[in-house]
């Protein structure tokens, strides 16, 4: 049996939107490929080969998204008392006062460029956050090295 993929509601919706965009791209890539095949005298044409490769990449992305979505289990919003999958966590460095906001998500949703930063529950940082409560101080491995953070707030 295929393993379930836990997603937040927003993550599920974002992946559905990506799937729709990829399907639109596939239609366009198919149209371009057909036009190239009809106009090409030489089937070894590099433009034709590039179009075939692009179509294959899009199809692979669609397959991947469909697989993830078919196994998706949408998470219920948490109580906000304990950090779990889907929780948005406000952290503060007790020494500098620097604040950091992260959301603990499944690997399928992880994206450090999002705001708040989406951290995989399978990552070292994600694993370290799980189960903590407001007021807890924990040591996290960050790009700046090991740092102490205090949990200031937990949402969802």
UniProtKB/Swiss-Prot annotation:
Segments traversing the membrane: none
Family of the protein in this entry: Belongs to the GreA/GreB family.
Subunit composition and interactions: Interacts with RNAP.
Name listed for the protein in its UniProt record: Transcription inhibitor protein Gfh1
Coiled coil in keyword set: yes
GO biological process: DNA-templated transcription elongation; regulation of DNA-templated transcription elongation
Regions annotated as coiled coil: 1-74
Presence of the UniProt keyword Transcription in the record: yes
Biological function: Inhibits all catalytic activities of RNA polymerase (RNAP) by partially occluding its substrate-binding site and preventing NTP binding.
Listed Pfam families: GreA_GreB, GreA_GreB_N
């Amino acid at each position: 049996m295929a393993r379930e993929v836990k997603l937040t509601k927003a993550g599920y919706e974002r992946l559905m939107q990506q799937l729709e965009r990829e399907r639109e791209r596939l239609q366009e890539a198919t149209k371009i490929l057909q036009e190239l095949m009809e106009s090409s005298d030489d089937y070894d044409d590099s433009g034709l080969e590039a179009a075939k490769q692009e179509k294959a990449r899009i199809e692979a992305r669609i397959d991947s998204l469909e697989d993830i979505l078919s196994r998706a289990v949408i998470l219920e919003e948490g109580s906000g008392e304990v950090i779990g999958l889907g929780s948005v966590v406000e952290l503060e460095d007790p020494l500098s006062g620097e604040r950091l906001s992260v959301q603990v998500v499944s690997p399928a949703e992880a994206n450090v460029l999002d705001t708040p930063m989406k951290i995989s529950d399978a990552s070292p940082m994600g694993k370290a956050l799980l189960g903590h409560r407001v007021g807890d101080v924990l040591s996290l491995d960050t790009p700046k090295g090991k740092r102490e953070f205090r949990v200031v707030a937990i949402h969802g």
